[in-house]
Each structure stands twice: as structure tokens, then as C-alpha cells.
């Protein structure tokens, strides 16, 4: 049974519950039930917990008891609810008799904001209980997503407040509030700032209630954004100041705004405007004939999804557009659908198929290999990716194929199976898919492919087909043999290389081909196991306290320790506003082996003794004799949850007071080291990740000096009171900061790895400093003044795609290597790439490549077509290598072999395996390759040239018959619409260009083509799909699991039609004269100009610890001649409600039928690098005009909660010379606006609608009709053109 969560495409699904039933369901779920939770971790046994729905926040929570919530998920993130034991979490306990729940008592919730969803696997006490949860949650899912924005804000505010107010006391401290605002991307400069903005404090404790918090939020949002250039704001703000609730926007004023500024034709109907306002506000006190907005509510509306720039009317499928042949559509297509991550070690998963199909994907791939018991398995052959059963995949496809869309699904079969297993495949196709499987043509007499409407709810097989009358035979393949295809590798897997600095062994991915050994940069040895990382066992529970921030060790002798503790607590609590119960623990000065708990209460520091004693040889800790703990950590943890009780008070331990000087004993800290001395030390450690921290001369200032990308860099750290600041990231201490960046990248991909001091230099330092790490020179010993810097030619690697804006610029893709770079001032460099010499490119789009290490003899000449692609670190020529096993092992590794090259004196590479068997197999195969390299390559080419096909499988192929691409057949009678061809992106690039693009488009008008990523994209990255789309390729297959720009463009393309997976290509592309790369060939299309101002944003996501400094990049992507991008300035330290200065951006578009408007929000970090925050991408033809919200999505194209931009956008047709037509949409809209203004001015003066006001109303009506006629005529001339000011219904 398919899960619920997405309505069936044909309207089927559970019937909607009645209002009374909904009320009963919500009450029952709010009370909650006890259910058994099955974990995804192998180490955790199933547990019974209380599950409840928190209606105020729209969350599911679970806990052992009533006091503490252990976990929660947002209902808005739920994608699907499945009845039964339909997750792997249940499978782990199949052999355990204690956990064999009835199928009917179980259900699974799938949720998340990424491609790979998380699971909540539950066992209820009865089938009725399961039905209650599924029915209730299904209703709540839809209701939560459809809720008006003010209600969503209310739920979000309560969620933030309750995350701090865990005891539900309806109060939080000012320190909690400051931390909370930081978490939502708003910088609070100091506590005074908060106190000035909060009113009605409870003076006794200084706590803040939810009402005060909500009012503060409303005030912060409005006061920060009242300066935006918006209708109503300028005059009303002058009148009301900081009090937006003193100014009301009436129904009539709001109606005029919708008509005059937004071009909303439906707003002519006053009753519709009234109905909209009531549904948006949902305020019982304003359910009156003349509802109104307060000024801040109007601004909230402008940022809301109800005011989206996207015309939601286009979300519906238009059946009339589904009658063309399949070859006239773009079809949403997935590559290696079964993978959840990279191409060499990730997990193959049934869930990946379900997820893709539910995202509207209509062409999925099955990579089939011979498996056990005569049935194929699916995985990425000859790699470490896990395997799934072919039969299980078919059942998953059957369940999910037509949930999101009823239009046909194409199964692209990559067949590596024997004849016998092919026959079993065919049998299972028929058995499992039944009537949905297409086995005969829709119309034998047709001269083209059938339409999506003709193939509704059908599944098509794409597979090679035999000639008529053959039982089986060898057929030619359309794919050339390549030893660089990882599927053709002789062996691949994880081996280990020793780090020459710390002598630890780190995993690398190795690939052995018929002539070479390739190995990757450091990778993860995890082979895609679905389990979460197992928690590490503590070395000893009695020592757990030593790493806690509240433990300060010995603070001083005698009473000094007491005085120091009192000073630390007093300074911390006064400066930060920390609440009562803030505490630290120190070693007792008086009683050896005991400790002292010092805490803050009512403005004073108090102390109590923590006793210790030995009990049967193990220490015990207690405050009172009747409650004893096994460790100091357990005691403190207990009193953080349960109050300390005495005659005078009850109080929980609340906030730990961090150590301020713990860094002084760390190996990386240097109290008196100059910048020059630090650089000299780091020059002797030629490894990225080497670092130290030094005290600077300025007060309360430090610096981290580190190596990254072969260079030495520095960044400042500032102590501000009790907080340590790195850029705009806050930490409690230097120790916390360093600990964080040992786990997370500090600069690009570099993590702090090797702490450097004199002792470390003696062990790992080189004799000669690497001066090239400090200056741009490459000659050791070459030393120059830092300013001016000499220019040296080097190589750089592209961080992003770049398309030339002028003839003297380079065009390149991400990861391209640009050679002979000459650095120039002004942010532009020159270099060689793609056969072009010394052209310009922006320097911030690239990073300089590090000098090749001595351990990589061929690093300078890396093969860009290697099977490891961008992951490649080194490559060795096997015939030139000698292999020797090291029987004694090396540095705690038992299974080690060495690779040496006689041609390179004194060079060898030590490689470790996980087992003796693995070592022997690698050594054996490498030696075999060394002896037979040339013969093996020839044999591989011969074997791949022809392939045997089973008749039973061939008979299932009706329309999608892959054949080698023959350019000579295009446009001739030999071209058959049932034949199709597949291309790796590298081969497709030979046809999607100015020379052959028009010819390839001609091919695609009749036949299907499928394009897929090149095999070297082992990181599952994607290519740019735009050139393939504009040349008519229908099946542009992408890695759906990868959150990159190509997938975001793919999601945008299929927005129209509600992600049904089929989008009709513009009629222009079916014009024989149309050339995809020549704008002069456009006929029947008017060019248009888009004018955009970015005004502000709300609720931007965070990226790491700091407050973001956002800027917005606006891009038009489409035909090559239309693509361009511009960007705003960045706003300092504000991701909650930033505002940008008014600056119009203009984009001229010649082909608006194939154009996308893309917004990307980046933050600029302390190194001036740009980091992705959010994005939104739309087809230009679906945009609305006026003051519009741009709802933002994450990199997986999932909606971010409440995140949006506010823009002012206008779209108008333009002649070639840029002049406006006198009857253009803009001119007509201006006339309509003038008529609207006159009408409202008359009504405002007189207050009634009498005969003498008939003329202004008639002028308004006529202008609106002219505007509508203008669009109708344009729609007739060019179907589905960009609407300038169409019926923009909310």
C-alpha cells in the first residue's frame, strides 16, 4: 500500500474528515499515546515513549516522562506516512523475539528537508491507534502548509520560545532571549539594547513572557524595515513613528494597492478583497464589513507566500497541453536513481526511487547486474555502493509511480545481466507491474510517438531491442568502451595512506584500471551505511566532568579559589544577564578529593560542598547522604533537571559559567609569539590544517595562524566580555572555538588539524622553511617585500561556472583547470583554457592550485578524464610500478604494501588494507595488470562492442529503443521515432553548440534523446542542463540526490504543471527556422525587459555559528545570448530582517519562453568568500509584477520556513532599440493605474457611488479591458508568453 502525504494524481486518497472528526483527532493526538520507537542506530534497542502533537507549534514530540521532551519533528517537514513495517528500522530486530510487532500495528513517518529523508518508525498498541495517527497527521500536514502566514509566524514564535522555556513556565531570561535571537540570525549588540526595547519587565526576576517576546519580534521586524521604499510606509511612518499599530490600512486602500501596484485584476471585486483580508488575518475582532491591516501587518503580507512573485495558477496541470508527441516535452529524468550519495561508496536505496517518483521524476534508471538466486541486483557496478534487489525495486516503483503524477514513467534499463537473468527480469516486469506495463503500441499506424495523455498511468521500458525473428543475438552497443569508466575498473575500494605529519592512516578511494592506479583525496571509509554514527563510549564515567565547560579545576590556594569563583560568576552574570542557577564547579581547597559547587542566586554567589567517598574501591559523589552518584558529571546533570532543595529555596542549576583561561594550557596556544615568528613556524610544516593561536598586542585580541591551500593565513579573534568572537561567530571560549573548527571547516574545506609548537616542529618540521607558502614565489629562498606583490604564472581551479560577458573573457565550468595564469590588479586575471589563450576571468571564481606533493609524481599532469574526476589526488602508471608486501606492517597497520617506481629515485608509497585477504587481492591484481596492460585494454574494447539480449525482455520494448546515434539519418526517411540515443554529457556537448545545435534540435523533434552525467562525476555532481534543453533533448538525466544549481534549475523547469514531470517545449522550438544559439531566428516572440529592485529579506537561514552578512545574486539563465547575472551589496550582521538600498537591476531577454529568473542569497564570510544560504528559481513566463515576495528554498529546493525576499519587479516588452510600444503592457498598466487612482479619489471625496461617478468607473473598466485584450492577443500570437500584468490572482 502506498503511503499518504501526497494526494494521488487522479484525486484518489483518504476521504477528508468532517470538522467534528478533525476536532476529535486533534484532541486525541494532543493528549498523545504510548508507542514503541524503533531506532535507526543498531546500538539502540526499541523503547516505549509518549508521543504527542503540539498544536501550538505543529510538532510531533516524544519523551519518557512529562518533564523533558527528548525529540521532535516539524509537521511541515513530513513528506509521507506509510502504514506497516516499511522501513529498515524494523528489519534490524526481525530475529529478536521481543520485538516482532504486528504489521497492522506499525507505521512510518518520512520527513526531512533533504533528498534523503529521515524515518520515525513506530509501533502502536492497536490498528485503530495507527489509523488515528495516520488520519490525524494527514489532515495536519495539509492544514499546516496551507495556514496563512500570520498563523505560521505565531507557530514559529512559540516554537522558538518553547525551545528555551523547556519547563513551560511562560518565562525566559534576557540571556536566553539574546541567545535565541542570535540563533535566528539577529545580532544583539548588548543587553542594554534588549532592555530598551522590552517593556513591563517583572522587576523581581527580569524574566520575559511569551507576550513580551512576540511584541519584541513584531517591533524588531517593523523598525528595521520601515525604511524600505514601499507604498504607505513613507507618510504613515512619519505619522506613527515606531508604533505601526497606530496606523490602519483600510479595505479600500488595500484594494487600490492591489489594483494600482500589483496589477491584480481580481481585486476589482471588493468582496474578494474582503474575503482575502479576513482569511489572511484570521482575527475574530476584525471579522467585520470593513477589515483593516495595521501597518506592520501589511509589510508582513508583502513578504508572505500569499504575495508570491510566482503565478500559482500555473501549478495546475493543463490537460490540453498533454496531447503532443512525447518528443515535444521536457521529461523530468534521474541518473543512477538508486543512489543516495556519491557514485562509489554511497547506499543504494529503495527510498531513492520512492523519493524521485514523488518529486515528479518520470524517467528513472535501473542499473542491473547478475545477483544470487537467478535474480538481478541493482547497484553501481564494480564499486562499493550497496546492492538492492531488482524485485524490491519493481514493487517500490509500482507503489509510488503515479502518486505525484499520472503521466507515463520510463524505466531506463542499464543491463549487465546474463540471458537467464534477463528472462527473469522480463517475467518480473510483467508480474509486478501488470496492466501498467506498456507491451504494445498505442497506434500502429502513427508516424510519431504517443502523447502523455495517451500513455496515462503507463510504464515504458527503455532497453535494447532485437531485430524481428531473433530468439537472441548480439546487438551493437551505443557506448564506447572506456577504461576510465569506473564500471570497467578491475578493482576499486578503500585503502589507507599515512599522513606524514601525525602518522595517522586516512582512507582514500583507489581505482585499478587496465593501465593505471588512481587514488582520491582523503575520503570517508563509511560505505553508505544508513545507520547514524554510533556514539563513542567514554573512557571512564568518573572523568566525564573534565571536558565540561562548568568544570574549572583548581582555581587557587586557600580562599583564593573562592574569591576567583565569586569574581567569575559575578562578572559573567552581570555582563550577560545570566539567570539564577548559573554555576561552576571547582576543586575544593579545604577537603582533598572533594569539590565545591558555586552558583548565582538573587544577585549573590553561594557555595556548597560536593562530598566524595570510596565505596568498594569506586568513588561516589553527593550533596546529601540520601542521594549518591557514581560520578561528578552525573550529580551535576541530575541537578540541572531536578531542583536543589533546602529550607530557603528550590533552584535548578541553569547555565554553566565557562572557563576564561583554559586555553593557556593548550598545545596550540602561544602567549608571546609575533606574526613573523608564527609564519616561520608554519613554513616548516607543509601541510594544510597546521595551526597555532597567538596573543596579539591589542587588548583582548588573539589570532589563529594556519595553513590552507598551501598558503599561510591569519584571522583575528576578539574577546568581548564573556564572549569570544571570530568574525561574527560567537563562542564561549577560545577552547570552544578551536574545538568547533577542528570538526568544521574554518577556511573553505580546511579544518584545524595539526597544533604547532616547538615540540611538534622537532617531530614533523622540515629543516628548510617553505617561503612559497608565504609569498607567491615558487623558488625556496626567494623573499620579496609583501607590497607590491610580483606576478607569477600558475594554475587555478574554478570554484563556480562562469560564462563570458565579453569576447576577451574565458567561459569555464566548475572545477576547470586554467593554466598559465597571470595575476592582475582589479579582481581580474588572465589565463589559458579550452584552447583560448590569455583571456580575462574574475579572480574570485577560482582558487590557486597547491604545489604537487612529492608523493604524487604525476600530479602536475592529472588526467581530467580519470574515473575519479574532481576527486583525483594522484595517478600511477602500473607498468612502471613495483609492488612489495611489508610483512612487518607499519605504524599500527598490519596489512601494508609499498608501491615504488624505479624511474623516480627514493620514492615509494605505503598503502594499507583492512585485511590480509584484501591486501593479497590488490597486490595480485596490480601485478597482473603490470604484465598484461595492453592486452587487457584491447580485450575490454572487444567484449563491450556487442551485447546479447533475451527475446522475452526485447518484447517489452515498444517506443524507447536505444540505438547508436547516426547524424546522417536526421531528417530522412530512415529516422524512426521509436529509436532513441543516449549520450554522456561530454558527447552531447559536441552537438549542443552553435555548429550543430539546430541539427540536434531537428533530431529531437521526432525522436527521444537521453543525456547523463559523465562517469568521472563520482561526487554525483551535475552538468549544466540548459544547453541540452534548448536543443530539444527531452530526457536530461540528473543526480536528484545532489543539491546543486543544475538540480535547482530542473526543479524550476518542472514547476509549471505542478511537478507532473512533463513540460511542453515552446512552439518556437518546433519552428524549422529556429536556431537555439541565434536570437535572430526567433519569430513571433517579443523581447522583454525585467526591472528588479531587491528591497529586503526575512528569516534567512544561518550558515554555521555566526550571524550572516547577506547579499543577493540575481541571474537570468536561459538561452546563451540572454544569460547574465548581477548582485546587490552585502548587509552587515543581519539575516533576520536585512534591508538593501534602492538599486534597480535591468535584464533584457530575447527569448522569454526559455528563460529563468534566479535569486541566490549568499553570505560573505570573514575571508570574503561567498557561502550559499538560499535560492529561488522561476520560469520567467510565470512571474507576477509589483511588490512581490520571493519565497526562498534551501539547496534541495525545499521551502525554508518563513524565509523570503521582497522585490519590486516590472516586466515590459521591448523593441530591438529598447523603446516601449505605445500600446505595450507597461503603457496600458499606467493608464489603468491612472484610472484607478481617479476612481478612488472620487469615491474618497463623495463616499458613495452615484451616476456622476459613472465616467471614472467606465474609464477604469475600459483600461482594464484593453490591458486584458493586450495579453489575450499576445497569448494568441505566442502561446504561454511572459505575462506582463496578467490576472495575478493571489
UniProtKB/Swiss-Prot annotation:
The keyword Hydrolase applies. Its EC number is 3.1.4.11. The keyword Lipid metabolism applies. Residues 27-142, 489-523, 895-931 form the PH domain. It catalyses: a 1,2-diacyl-sn-glycero-3-phospho-(1D-myo-inositol-4,5-bisphosphate) + H2O = 1D-myo-inositol 1,4,5-trisphosphate + a 1,2-diacyl-sn-glycerol + H(+); a 1,2-diacyl-sn-glycero-3-phospho-(1D-myo-inositol) + H2O = 1D-myo-inositol 1-phosphate + a 1,2-diacyl-sn-glycerol + H(+). The active site is at 335, 380. The modification N-acetylalanine is found at residue 2. Residues 550-657, 668-756 form the SH2 domain. Gene3D superfamilies: C2 domain, EF-hand, Phosphatidylinositol (PI) phosphodiesterase, Pleckstrin-homology domain (PH domain)/Phosphotyrosine-binding domain (PTB), SH2 domain, SH3 Domains. Residues 791-851 form the SH3 domain. Its cofactor is Ca(2+). Optimum pH is 5. Residues 953-1070 form the PI-PLC Y-box domain. Interacts with AGAP2 via its SH3 domain. Interacts (via SH2 domain) with RET. Interacts with FLT1 (tyrosine-phosphorylated). Interacts (via SH2 domain) with FGFR1, FGFR2, FGFR3 and FGFR4 (phosphorylated). Interacts with LAT (phosphorylated) upon TCR activation. Interacts (via SH3 domain) with the Pro-rich domain of TNK1. Associates with BLNK, VAV1, GRB2 and NCK1 in a B-cell antigen receptor-dependent fashion. Interacts with CBLB in activated T-cells; which inhibits phosphorylation. Interacts with SHB. Interacts (via SH3 domain) with the Arg/Gly-rich-flanked Pro-rich domains of KHDRBS1/SAM68. Mediates the production of the second messenger molecules diacylglycerol (DAG) and inositol 1,4,5-trisphosphate (IP3). Plays an important role in the regulation of intracellular signaling cascades. Becomes activated in response to ligand-mediated activation of receptor-type tyrosine kinases, such as PDGFRA, PDGFRB, EGFR, FGFR1, FGFR2, FGFR3 and FGFR4. Plays a role in actin reorganization and cell migration. This is 1-phosphatidylinositol 4,5-bisphosphate phosphodiesterase gamma-1. The gene is Plcg1.
Amino acid at each position: 500500500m502506498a503511503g499518504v502525504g501526497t494526494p494521488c494524481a487522479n484525486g484518489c486518497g483518504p476521504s477528508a474528515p468532517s470538522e467534528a472528526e478533525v476536532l476529535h483527532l486533534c484532541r486525541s493526538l494532543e493528549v498523545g499515546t504510548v508507542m514503541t520507537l524503533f531506532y535507526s542506530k543498531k546500538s539502540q534497542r526499541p523503547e516505549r515513549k509518549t508521543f504527542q502533537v503540539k498544536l501550538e507549534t505543529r510538532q510531533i514530540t516524544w519523551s519518557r516522562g512529562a518533564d523533558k521532551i527528548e525529540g521532535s519533528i516539524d509537521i511541515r517537514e513530513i513528506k509521507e506516512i506509510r502504514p506497516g513495517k516499511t522501513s529498515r528500522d524494523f528489519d534490524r530486530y526481525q530475529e529478536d523475539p521481543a520485538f516482532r510487532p504486528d504489521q497492522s500495528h506499525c507505521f512510518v513517518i518520512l520527513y526531512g528537508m533533504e533528498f534523503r529523508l529521515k524515518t520515525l518508525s513506530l509501533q502502536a498498541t492497536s490498528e485503530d491507534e495507527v489509523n488515528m495517527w495516520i488520519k490525524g497527521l494527514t489532515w495536519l500536514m495539509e492544514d499546516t502548509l496551507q495556514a496563512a502566514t500570520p498563523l505560521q509566524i505565531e507557530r514559529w514564535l512559540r516554537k522558538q520560545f518553547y525551545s528555551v522555556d523547556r519547563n513551560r513556565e511562560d518565562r525566559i531570561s534576557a540571556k536566553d532571549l539574546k541567545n535565541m535571537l542570535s540563533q535566528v540570525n539577529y545580532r544583539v549588540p548588548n543587553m542594554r539594547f534588549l532592555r530598551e526595547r522590552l517593556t513591563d519587565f517583572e522587576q523581581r526576576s527580569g524574566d520575559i513572557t511569551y507576550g513580551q517576546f512576540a511584541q519584541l519580534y513584531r517591533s524588531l521586524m517593523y523598525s528595521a524595515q520601515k525604511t524600505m521604499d514601499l507604498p504607505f510606509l513613507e507618510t504613515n511612518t512619519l505619522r506613527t513613528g515606531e508604533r505601526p499599530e497606530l496606523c490602519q490600512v483600510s479595505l479600500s486602500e488595500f484594494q487600490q494597492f492591489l489594483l494600482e501596484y500589483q496589477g491584480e485584476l481580481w481585486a476589482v471585486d471588493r468582496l474578494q478583497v474582503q474575503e482575502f483580508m479576513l482569511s489572511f488575518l484570521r482575527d475574530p475582532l476584525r471579522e467585520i464589513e470593513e477589515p483593516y491591516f495595521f501597518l506592520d501587518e501589511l509589510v508582513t503580507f508583502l513578504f508572505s507566500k500569499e504575495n508570491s512573485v510566482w503565478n500559482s495558477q500555473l501549478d495546475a496541470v493543463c490537460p490540453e497541453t498533454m496531447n503532443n508527441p512525447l518528443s515535444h516535452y521536457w521529461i523530468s529524468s534521474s541518473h543512477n536513481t538508486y543512489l543516495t550519495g556519491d557514485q562509489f561508496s554511497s547506499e543504494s536505496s529503495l527510498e531513492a526511487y520512492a523519493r524521485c517518483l514523488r518529486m515528479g521524476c518520470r524517467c528513472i534508471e535501473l542499473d542491473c547486474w547478475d545477483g544470487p538466486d537467478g535474480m538481478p541486483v541493482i547497484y553501481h557496478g564494480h564499486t562499493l555502493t550497496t546492492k538492492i534487489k531488482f524485485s524490491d525495486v519493481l514493487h517500490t516503483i509500482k507503489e509510488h509511480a503515479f502518486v505525484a503524477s499520472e503521466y507515463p514513467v520510463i524505466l531506463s534499463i542499464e543491463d549487465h545481466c546474463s540471458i537467464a537473468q534477463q528472462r527473469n527480469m522480463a517475467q518480473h516486469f510483467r508480474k509486478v507491474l501488470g496492466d501498467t506495463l506498456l507491451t504494445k503500441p498505442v497506434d500502429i499506424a502513427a508516424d510519431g510517438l504517443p502523447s502523455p495523455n495517451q500513455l496515462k498511468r503507463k510504464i515504458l521500458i527503455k532497453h535494447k531491442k532485437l531485430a524481428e525473428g531473433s530468439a537472441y543475438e548480439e546487438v551493437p552497443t551505443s557506448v564506447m568502451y572506456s577504461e576510465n569508466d569506473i564500471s570497467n575498473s578491475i578493482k576499486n575500494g578503500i585503502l589507507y595512506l599515512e599522513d606524514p605529519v601525525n602518522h595517522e592512516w586516512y582512507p582514500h578511494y583507489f581505482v585499478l584500471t587496465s593501465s593505471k592506479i588512481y587514488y582520491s583525496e582523503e575520503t570517508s571509509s563509511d560505505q553508505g551505511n544508513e545507520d547514524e554514527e554510533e556514539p563513542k563510549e567514554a573512557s571512564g564515567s568518573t572523568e566525564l566532568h573534565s571536558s565540561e565547560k562548568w568544570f574549572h579545576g583548581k582555581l587557587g590556594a586557600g580562599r583564593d579559589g573562592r574569591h576567583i569563583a565569586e569574581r567569575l560568576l559575578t562578572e559573567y552574570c552581570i555582563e550577560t544577564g545570566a539567570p539564577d542557577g548559573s554555576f561552576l564547579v571547582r576543586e575544593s581547597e579545604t577537603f582533598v578529593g572533594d569539590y565545591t559547587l558555586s552558583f548565582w542566586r538573587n544577585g549573590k554567589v553561594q557555595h556548597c560542598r560536593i562530598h566524595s567517598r570510596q565505596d568498594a574501591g569506586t568513588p561516589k559523589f553527593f550533596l546529601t547522604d540520601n542521594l549518591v552518584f557514581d560520578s561528578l558529571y552525573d550529580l551535576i546533570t541530575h541537578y540541572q533537571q531536578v531542583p536543589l532543595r533546602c529550607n530557603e529555596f528550590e533552584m535548578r542549576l541553569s547555565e554553566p559559567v565557562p572557563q576564561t583561561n583554559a586555553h593557556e594550557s593548550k598545545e596550540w596556544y602561544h602567549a608571546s609569539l609575533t606574526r613573523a615568528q608564527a609564519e616561520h613556524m608554519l613554513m616548516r610544516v607543509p601541510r594544510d590544517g597546521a595551526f597555532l593561536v597567538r596573543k596579539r598586542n591589542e587588548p583582548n585580541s588573539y589570532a589563529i595562524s594556519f595553513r590552507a591551500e598551501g598558503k599561510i593565513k591569519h584571522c583575528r579573534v576578539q574577546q568581548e566580555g564573556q564572549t569570544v568572537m571570530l568574525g561574527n561567530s560567537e563562542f564561549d571560549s577560545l577552547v570552544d572555538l578551536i574545538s568547533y573548527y577542528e570538526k568544521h571547516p574554518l577556511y573553505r574545506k580546511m579544518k584545524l588539524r595539526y597544533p604547532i609548537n616547538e615540540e611538534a616542529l622537532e617531530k614533523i618540521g622540515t629543516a628548510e622553511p617553505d617561503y612559497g607558502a608565504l609569498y607567491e614565489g615558487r623558488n625556496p629562498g626567494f623573499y620579496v617585500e609583501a607590497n607590491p606583490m610580483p606576478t607569477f604564472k600558475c594554475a587555478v581551479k574554478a570554484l563556480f561556472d562562469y560564462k563570458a560577458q565579453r569576447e576577451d573573457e574565458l567561459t569555464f565550468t566548475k572545477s576547470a583547470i586554467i593554466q598559465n595564469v597571470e595575476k592582475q590588479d582589479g579582481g581580474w586575471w588572465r589565463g589559458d583554457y579550452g584552447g583560448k589563450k590569455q583571456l580575462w576571468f574574475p579572480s574570485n571564481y577560482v582558487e590557486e592550485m597547491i604545489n604537487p606533493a612529492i608523493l604524487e609524481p604525476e600530479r602536475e599532469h592529472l588526467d581530467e578524464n580519470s574515473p575519479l574526476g574532481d576527486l583525483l589526488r594522484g595517478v600511477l602508471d602500473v607498468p612502471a610500478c613495483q609492488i612489495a608486501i611489508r610483512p612487518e606492517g607499519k605504524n599500527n597497520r598490519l596489512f601494508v604494501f609499498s608501491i615504488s617506481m624505479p624511474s623516480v629515485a627514493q620514492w615509494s608509497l605505503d598503502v594499507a588494507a583492512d585485511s590480509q585477504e584484501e591486501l593479497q587481492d590488490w597486490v595480485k591484481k596490480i601485478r597482473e595488470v603490470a604484465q598484461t596492460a595492453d592486452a587487457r585494454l584491447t580485450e575490454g574494447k572487444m567484449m563491450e562492442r556487442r551485447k546479447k539480449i533475451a527475446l522475452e525482455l526485447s518484447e517489452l520494448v515498444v517506443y524507447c529503443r536505444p540505438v547508436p546515434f547516426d547524424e546522417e539519418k536526421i531528417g530522412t526517411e530512415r529516422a524512426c521515432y521509436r529509436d532513441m540515443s543516449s549520450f554522456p554529457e561530454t558527447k552531447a556537448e559536441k552537438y549542443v553548440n552553435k555548429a550543430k545545435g539546430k541539427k540536434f534540435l531537428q533530431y529531437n523533434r521526432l525522436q527521444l534523446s537521453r543525456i547523463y552525467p559523465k562517469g568521472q562525476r563520482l561526487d554525483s555532481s551535475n552538468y549544466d542542463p540548459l544547453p541540452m534543453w534548448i536543443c530539444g533533448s527531452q530526457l536530461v538525466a540528473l543526480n536528484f540526490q545532489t543539491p546543486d544549481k543544475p538540480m535547482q534549475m530542473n526543479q524550476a523547469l518542472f514547476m509549471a504543471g505542478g511537478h507532473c514531470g512533463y513540460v511542453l517545449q515552446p512552439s518556437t522550438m518546433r519552428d524549422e527556422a529556429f536556431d537555439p544559439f541565434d536570437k535572430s531566428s526567433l519569430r513571433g516572440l517579443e523581447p522583454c525587459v525585467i526591472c528588479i529592485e531587491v528591497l529586503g529579506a526575512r528569516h534567512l537561514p544561518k550558515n554555521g555559528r555566526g550571524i550572516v552578512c547577506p547579499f543577493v545574486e540575481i541571474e537570468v539563465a536561459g538561452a546563451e545570448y540572454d544569460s547574465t547575472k548581477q548582485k546587490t551589496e552585502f548587509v552587515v550582521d543581519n539575516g533576520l530582517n536585512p534591508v538593501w538600498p534602492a538599486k534597480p537591476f535591468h535584464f533584457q531577454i530575447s527569448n522569454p519562453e526559455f528563460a529563468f529568473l534566479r535569486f541566490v542569497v549568499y553570505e560573505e564570510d570573514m575571508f570574503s568568500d561567498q557561502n550559499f544560504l538560499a535560492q529561488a528559481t522561476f520560469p520567467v513566463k510565470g512571474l507576477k509584477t509589483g511588490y512581490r515576495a520571493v519565497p526562498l528554498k534551501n539547496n534541495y529546493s525545499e521551502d525554508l520556513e518563513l524565509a523570503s525576499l521582497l522585490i519590486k519587479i516590472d516586466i515590459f516588452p521591448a523593441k530591438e532599440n529598447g523603446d516601449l510600444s505605445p500600446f505595450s503592457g507597461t503603457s496600458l498598466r499606467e493608464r489603468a493605474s491612472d484610472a484607478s487612482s481617479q476612481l478612488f479619489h472620487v469615491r474618497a471625496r463623495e463616499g458613495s457611488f452615484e451616476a456622476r461617478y459613472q465616467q471614472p468607473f467606465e474609464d477604469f473598466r475600459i483600461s482594464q479591458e484593453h490591458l486584458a485584450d493586450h495579453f489575450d492577443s499576445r497569448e494568441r500570437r505566442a502561446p504561454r508568453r511572459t505575462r506582463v500584468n496578467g490576472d495575478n490572482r493571489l
